[in-house]
Amino acid sequence: MKQFPFVVFEGLDGAGKTTLAELFAKRHSFSYYTSIPPELISIRKQIAATHSPISTFHFYSLCNIMRNHEYALQLNDSGVVADRYIFSTFAYHSLLMQQDLSYHFRLLQSEQKFLLPDVVVYVTASQPVINQRIANRSQEVPIQWYGDKVSLEYNVSESYKRIFALVDIPILQIDTTNSDPEQAYSILCHELDRISKTTPVLRSIEFSASTN
């Protein structure tokens, strides 16, 4: 049984998810994980080069399964922050594959050892802000057809809502449209403190915005 909180950060590309996830993990000494295990990073470009949504769906599903085992071990020693998890995989690929993937999601849930987080932090921003942020960073990092492009061309927010409806865990939505990282972090701490009253594993954590 895990001893520490497991927090997943989800959201559209360009919403500020990674910035907020890294800040939260640093301030609270949680272990921070990206979605892809080190062992699979070397084949990501090959998978992306297929331009096959089925291929990327199975690739990220494998990433989730491998990370799940890592999280289960790490949660004995510290809190875990996951920068994307199964929710992204299903929200994005439901759109790319134009299929209802809820059956596959429930199949994962049926695996007794598969971990769901204690809380999901869903980071959003207005579409114009997201478009501008993606445009700014695309000058240095190419737009991914299975990531940034999906955020630009599809209604990913609605897809996320359909996936979130499949689980019974707190979903905290943090809108960064008019917030800098520190402001968003302060709002997040307030929301986490609020739900800690009904989420026992969070009660031992000091969710103060002043944490250094």
Task: Report each predicted region and the residues it spans.
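Hydrophobic anchor at the beta1->P-loop junction of P-loop NTPases
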Residues: 9
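Conserved lysine of the Walker
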Residues: 17
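A glycine- and Lys/Arg-enriched "phosphate-lid" helix/loop adjacent to the NTP-binding pocket
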Residues: 92-159
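Hydrophobic positions on the alpha1 helix immediately C-terminal to the Walker A/P-loop
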Residues: 20, 24
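P-loop (Walker A) phosphate-binding loop of NTP-binding proteins
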Residues: 12
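Phosphate-binding P-loop
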Residues: 1-4
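NTP-dependent small-molecule kinase module
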Residues: 131-212
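ATP-dependent small-molecule kinase phosphotransfer cores
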Residues: 31-103
